[in-house]
Structure formats: structure tokens, C-alpha cells
């Protein structure tokens, strides 16, 4: 089971930012990633629907790849489905919100923390709860930024248009005197330059991906699941969207030239499968 891959899932390609951190921290681990681009965005969807999608993807990754752990590399899906998945799957399940909240608490100096995320993540209030649980004197300012997800999926990251959209989305944070901003959607680290430009150098950006990779490593170690191999692990990719578009983004964002993604139809995800 140590050689089995770590599964990662996201509503689109944003979760590749988490995969990149996992590969950097755990280079010998095998991984398999599924981006559900055909059903993007998850943000406006109901908790029940996002939970159903997460269950379908987890079932697919277990059946197709025999994953030893699941990283929900999507803040919206983490907020909606993490507890359910942890209660129902016989493997470790890691989300991105708790690690991101903890990183924000460790980073802030004035305890004024901004959170940018999808509407679903903001509505869940999970970042606020997790931050306040660790630092009750914190003030949290959350903003839903769905247009920024679209920018990332379209690979529009550094243009004047991208900077304009990001600045408009973050305008309500400008008078809040935050010193820390959580990029509470895995797409947003791809827009780091535009985000930093909008909020200024005095604000520290927190990418939950690194903290999530660190938590994944710790959990695998606790369960005796770390891969003892000494060679670089393999990486498989699946998408419910267009494979050519996915491959272009993956090759641009990851440190290595990834193998081509395989297409998965929604029918494949919604058909019941036998999983041991």
C-alpha cells in the first residue's frame, strides 16, 4: 500500500497548485489527479451537490488507481464534503482549509486576516471558524471572487485585464488594514502576482497548498504510508474537460512535463462501481 498513489481532486485545474507542493515535498510519491472541469464552477453549487461530486471522484480514483489517501485540493469541496468523506472512506482524507487557516494564524501580526475564495467557501464560513478556533482575537474579512477562478481556468494570469479584474474583486479589502491574505481557492496562487499588486507588499499572501502538503506528509507518516522508493514518483492525470487545454495548463504550472491527461466522462463518474 505504500507504493499506491496519493489521489488529488479539484473542480478544475487549480488543484495543480497543491499537487505541485505535494510533488516538491514528497518527490518519491506516486500521484493521480482529477480535475472536474466539465462541472466547474463548484462555488455556486449546493453543499449536497458538491458532496455528491466529491464522492463520485473519490470512488473513481479508488477504483481506477487504488489511492492510499485523498487530498481534496479544492476549498469549496473541502468546506462541503471533508467531514463526510473522512467518515465514509477507509483511507486518510485531507482538506485544504484547516492547513490554510493555521498558516494564516502563524503569519499574521495584527490579527486582521483577509480570505478570498469562492461563494461556496465564503458561505460555509469554515475559514472564519478555523481561524477563530486557533486565534479568537482575530478579525476575518472574507470576499467571494468567482471571476478570478475564470481567469485562472482561461490562463489569463498576468494581463492588464487580469490585474483589473483582481483589483476590482479585492477592492472591498483595501480599507480593512489586513496584513495577511489567504488565497482560499486553489486557483488563486496562479494569480499571485496580480493579487500581490492589488493588495500591496505590506500584505503577506498565504497559499494553503504548502501547508496541505505538509499535513499530507505528516498523516502518511503517522499511518505508515510513506513511499520508501528513492526514485521520483509517477503522476497520472484525468479531466472531465478538454484534455488538450488541461495538458497546456499542467505543463505550464508544474515543474515537470506531465504525461497527457485522460478524459473521464461524467457518465463514468456517475456509474456505480465496485470498490474494495
Swiss-Prot record:
NCBIfam families: glut_race
Residues spanning the membrane: none
Cross-referenced HAMAP family: Glu_racemase
Keywords carried by this UniProt record: Cell shape, Cell wall biogenesis/degradation, Isomerase, Peptidoglycan synthesis
GO MF, one annotated term: glutamate racemase activity
Family under the similarity heading: Belongs to the aspartate/glutamate racemases family.
Active site per UniProt: 74, 185
Functional summary from the UniProt entry: Provides the (R)-glutamate required for cell wall biosynthesis.
Organism expressing this protein natively: Levilactobacillus brevis (strain ATCC 367 / BCRC 12310 / CIP 105137 / JCM 1170 / LMG 11437 / NCIMB 947 / NCTC 947) (Lactobacillus brevis)
A Gene Ontology biological process term: cell wall organization
Any single Pfam family the record assigns to this protein: Asp_Glu_race
Pathway in which this enzyme or protein is active: Cell wall biogenesis; peptidoglycan biosynthesis
Binding site for substrate: 10-11, 42-43, 75-76, 186-187
Coiled coil: none
Listed name of the protein: Glutamate racemase
Gene3D superfamilies noted in UniProt: 3.40.50.1860
Stored InterPro entries: Asp/Glu/hydantoin_racemase, Asp/Glu_race, Asp/Glu_racemase_AS_1, Asp/Glu_racemase_AS_2, Glu_race
EC identifiers of the protein: 5.1.1.3
EC top class, as a word: isomerase
Catalytic activity as recorded in UniProt: L-glutamate = D-glutamate
Amino acid at each position: 500500500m505504500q507504493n499506491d498513489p496519493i489521489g488529488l481532486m479539484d473542480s478544475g485545474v487549480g488543484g495543480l497548485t497543491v499537487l505541485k507542493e505535494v510533488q516538491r515535498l514528497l518527490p518519491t510519491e506516486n500521484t493521480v489527479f482529477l480535475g472536474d472541469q466539465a462541472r466547474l464552477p463548484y462555488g455556486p453549487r449546493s453543499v449536497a451537490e458538491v458532496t455528491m461530486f466529491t464522492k463520485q471522484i473519490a470512488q473513481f480514483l479508488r477504483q481506477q488507481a487504488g489511492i492510499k489517501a485523498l487530498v481534496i485540493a479544492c476549498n469549496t469541496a473541502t468546506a462541503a464534503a471533508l467531514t463526510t468523506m473522512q467518515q465514509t472512506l477507509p483511507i486518510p482524507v485531507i482538506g485544504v482549509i484547516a492547513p490554510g487557516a493555521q498558516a494564516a494564524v502563524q503569519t499574521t501580526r495584527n490579527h486582521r486576516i483577509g480570505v478570498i475564495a469562492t461563494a461556496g467557501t465564503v458561505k460555509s464560513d469554515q475559514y472564519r471558524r478555523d481561524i477563530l478556533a486557533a486565534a479568537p482575537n482575530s478579525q476575518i474579512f472574507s470576499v467571494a471572487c468567482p471571476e478570478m477562478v475564470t481567469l485562472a481556468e482561461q490562463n489569463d494570469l498576468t494581463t492588464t485585464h487580469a490585474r483589473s479584474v483582481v483589483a476590482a474583486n479585492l477592492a472591498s479589502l483595501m480599507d480593512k488594514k489586513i496584513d495577511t491574505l489567504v488565497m482560499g481557492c486553489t486557483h488563486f496562487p496562479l494569480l499571485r502576482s496580480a493579487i500581490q499588486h492589488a493588495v500591496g507588499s505590506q500584505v503577506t499572501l498565504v497559499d494553503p497548498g504548502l501547508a496541505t502538503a505538509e499535513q499530507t506528509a505528516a498523516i502518511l507518516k503517522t499511518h505508515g504510508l510513506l513511499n520508501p522508493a528513492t526514485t521520483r514518483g509517477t503522476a497520472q492525470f484525468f479531466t472531465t474537460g478538454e484534455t488538450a487545454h488541461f495538458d497546456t495548463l499542467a505543463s505550464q504550472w508544474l515543474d515537470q512535463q506531465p504525461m497527457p491527461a485522460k478524459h473521464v466522462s461524467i457518465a463514468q463518474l456517475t456509474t456505480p462501481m465496485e470498490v474494495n
